[in-house]
Amino acid sequence: MQRRLIGKTVRGLALCLAFPATVPAQTQDTLFTERPLFVAGDAVLAAGFIAAAVAAAPADKWFTRQLQDEARQANRLLSRGFTVGRHWGNPGTLIAGAGIYAYGTATGNRRVQDLGLHSAGAVILANVVTGGIKVVAGRARPHVDTANARDFQLFRGLRDDAYRAFPSGHATAAFAFASVVTAETSHWWPDARWPVGVLTYGTATITAVSRIYNAQHWASDVLVGAAIGTVTGLKLFRYQHSHPDNTIDRKLLRAGLQSTAGRWSLFLMPARL
């Protein structure tokens, strides 16, 4: 039974990771045109994540036991890799987004600036959603009791961080960043689409698994977090580019820095790329 559940979970997660890479290609020809915020493909993406989370829930304890195994916990390579993944989820993604935006601003490269602003924005927005759910759901983290994966209590998350397991904020941030960066690079630099997608979604997956390894989340927590991050990132990308005159982009994407006679000053870049 558990093997079937695990197989379904793996297949569902594979579908979730593969599908976002196809979405940006659909946006290339209509990037600056009005289009619906939600399309049929979004339902497929959401259904894939939901199916994976539902399949994983009965096996939450199994995944935790496997990753909490003494041999795996003592493995230095795994420990270091998952430590990097944990730090990437928070604060790495936000720092990376802010750094990319700052570099684009300093060099006057609006495409890079666009990439940084939207990736950081997706991380923040997705974690606002996740943070609200955490407080309401009140799910106990695995380190509280590894034998009880169904310990939920409404609004208990207000009381203690130990009861903010569902969903994973680190997974949310990592997948939000991955979805926006992959979407943006797919449009501006099509040849980089697959390398960037594999790198960002692969790193996001390591971040998600690290949270189970560190007994901070159940498998279903990270899958739902990944869903929120991916969907939020794709929605923000679609909205920002189909509404290029939105307030945030209008104010923050036209700012640049230039050096004149040894002095730095702000200037406005063209309204369109």
Name every feature range the model reports, one short phrase each.
Residues 52-64:
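Alpha-helical transmembrane segments of multi-pass membrane proteins
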Residues 63-66, 96-99, 146:
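Short coil/turn segments at secondary-structure boundaries
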